[in-house]
């Protein structure tokens, strides 16, 4: 009898350890990665890409010879201003979406924000018409000596129907200030030029 009791007491720590492991596995299985606020907002913009952004376009603001600017109905976290731009084209309507995220005269502040926005946008996942697009791009460290830095994130070739869709993170000098923008657009060209293609 004493031998059985001793065996039982020896098993209790092992049983507790086993239960703890099962509990930890159960918790980890329930943890689902969540999108940050910026990813959620940009995801709303990208989700309307197949519709030509028609569901998020607001009132016309400015008309120029080559472009027409509209308000955007989607609010993006921390954005100063969001807009949709329609470009002149003889083939089809071409729209791009832009958000001004920061304007400052301090380069270090701009560089820090640029990195934060990149981290937020990297691996952005959006489901469009049954296809999941995961946007990725290599980080480029900005330099105060370079007046224009842009990082392009794209869904690669795993989603061929979305391969022309790009997200650009831009840091550029504007007079004495530094401006950060996020752009969503369709790139028709195969070259490395940034921004939407315009048909002559």
Where are the model-predicted features located?
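N-terminal Sec-dependent export signals
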Residues: 1, 13, 29-33, 40, ...
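Bacterial Sec-dependent N-terminal signal peptides
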Residues: 1-35
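N-terminal leader/targeting segments
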Residues: 30-95, 199-200
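Generic hydrophobic, helix-prone segments enriched in Leu/Val/Ile
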Residues: 38-46, 110-118, 182
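A structural detector for beta-sheet-dominated domains
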Residues: 43, 71-77, 83-88, 100-102, ...
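Long, charged/polar, surface-exposed segments that mediate recognition or autoinhibition
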Residues: 80-145
């Amino acid at each position: 009898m004493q031998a059985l009791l001793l065996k039982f007491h020896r098993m209790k720590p092992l049983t507790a350890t086993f239960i703890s492991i099962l509990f930890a596995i159960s918790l980890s299985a329930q943890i689902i990665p969540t999108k940050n606020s910026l990813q959620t907002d940009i995801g709303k913009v990208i989700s309307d890409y197949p519709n030509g952004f028609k569901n998020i376009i607001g009132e016309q603001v400015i008309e120029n010879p080559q472009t027409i600017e509209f308000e955007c109905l989607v609010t993006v976290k921390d954005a100063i201003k969001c807009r949709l731009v329609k470009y002149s084209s003889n083939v089809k309507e071409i729209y791009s979406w832009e958000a001004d995220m920061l304007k400052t005269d301090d380069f270090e502040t701009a560089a820090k924000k640029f990195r934060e926005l990149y981290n937020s946008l990297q691996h952005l996942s959006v489901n469009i018409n049954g296809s999941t697009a995961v946007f990725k791009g290599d980080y480029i460290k900005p330099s105060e000596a370079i007046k224009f830095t842009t990082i392009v994130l794209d869904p690669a070739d795993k989603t061929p129907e979305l391969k022309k869709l790009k997200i650009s993170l831009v840091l550029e000098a504007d007079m004495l200030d530094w401006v950060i923008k996020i752009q969503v657009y369709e790139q028709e060209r195969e070259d490395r030029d940034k921004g939407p293609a315009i048909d002559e």
